[in-house]
């Protein structure tokens, strides 16, 4: 364990809570002390839901540890079963309760409750939230379907042709506190419907026990979020023979590849390659003259595995950006993230220390950061534009409007979210670059009269006095930037200005120069070939 100001993922019981809260008719009894009830806020504050998550806490206190905490667990399990009468009951423990080793799942299993009881054993000190969500969904689905597993899988993917109906697929993986999951589901449903494909079950988001029991009736499973659903899709394939798609439809190219894969698995005629050009505005802009400003922009990407990999492909193949950093906090997705980074000639950053991520970001000196809420803070400190592409997120990244990431409309949303910060960055740079032009000087004549001229002149005088005084006040050994050096530095775009300043100061120390003038800046640029 470590003490930190920020964590990308919570403990695994938060992942279990996400699954329980995403479904209906499912209740979660969590053996936990008073302090672990904070998780309710994640759903009411960030997701802005109108109801609390379906969780009952045992909320034991320090004085309870001297007594029989097992009886406390059984009492709360019975009360939850009687009060909520769920279709399925999840029983687990928080990271703190794990130390007591009361084994609440085993206690609940022996109580003879009328509903299915699913025991969750989530190692809090070695696993984290996404793994907890994946394991919970897997255990719940496996517990409900184990009685109907056939002796030998005999699934016919093209049974829909013989039965005279449209093909049917399940969408697996979307959950609460996922990044735009609700909107992605609606967009993918619409996308598949346009191609004559029905959606049978969406799980866990919005699903109930009866929906889980209907999962084997689908012709194909669509794994939308591998972090949550890949293990469940693999189990369904092994035991029922139902194949699953592995392409996540985020971006123009990935959406087309997704449709091709789904059509191939279902035995359907593949879609037209030009469909994306007809349904999304992103390709048109990418081929326009205006987009040449974006070509070669340096981008640093960090997030969960699914969104980081998708972002890297969009940046490198569809927008013409140069990816200078790629990483993820999700160790379960480390292998595919490393493979994606290798294709781009990079070494992936697999790390959950936000300070290490910020240091890597500063070292890469990007012009745009695509990351989580934490990268937004880090980028703000470094003066770099940023767009959030992944959880963890702030409430502002859970819009009330529809704002998907998947499908053709998702490509439009992504384009807006990623390109606009760069456009605003260009505007800010131009304003800064021409700040001292005669048309921008406060003392310039204007239709507003002469009220501001004298004051502006005084301000410039004050600034020049302050600038000239800095050289005398600078402590010995500290580098001094001359007025012409500072003026030249300000002409450099703000998103790379920090790197140029560091290079110039490093060069000045190397050659023993105490003052950095415009000439020193040019020499440093030539030295570093930047």
From Swiss-Prot:
**Highest taxon, organism lineage:** Bacteria
Official protein name in the record: Light-independent protochlorophyllide reductase subunit B
- Alphabetical keyword list: 4Fe-4S, ATP-binding, Chlorophyll biosynthesis, Iron, Iron-sulfur, Metal-binding, Nucleotide-binding, Oxidoreductase, Photosynthesis
| Family to which this protein belongs | Belongs to the ChlB/BchB/BchZ family.
One Pfam family it belongs to: PCP_red
Sites where the protein binds substrate: 425-426
Protein EC: 1.3.7.7
Which residues bind [4Fe-4S] cluster per the record? 36
- Quaternary assembly: Protochlorophyllide reductase is composed of three subunits; ChlL, ChlN and ChlB. Forms a heterotetramer of two ChlB and two ChlN subunits.
Gene that this sequence comes from: chlB
Pathway, per UniProt? Answer: Porphyrin-containing compound metabolism; chlorophyll biosynthesis (light-independent)
Q: Which GO terms describe its molecular function?
A: 4 iron, 4 sulfur cluster binding; ATP binding; metal ion binding; oxidoreductase activity, acting on iron-sulfur proteins as donors; oxidoreductase activity, acting on the CH-CH group of donors, iron-sulfur protein as acceptor
The yes or no answer to whether the keyword Transmembrane is present is no
Question: According to its UniProt record, which cofactors does this protein need?
Answer: [4Fe-4S] cluster
Q: What does the protein in this record do?
A: Component of the dark-operative protochlorophyllide reductase (DPOR) that uses Mg-ATP and reduced ferredoxin to reduce ring D of protochlorophyllide (Pchlide) to form chlorophyllide a (Chlide). This reaction is light-independent. The NB-protein (ChlN-ChlB) is the catalytic component of the complex.
Catalyses:
chlorophyllide a + oxidized 2[4Fe-4S]-[ferredoxin] + 2 ADP + 2 phosphate = protochlorophyllide a + reduced 2[4Fe-4S]-[ferredoxin] + 2 ATP + 2 H2O
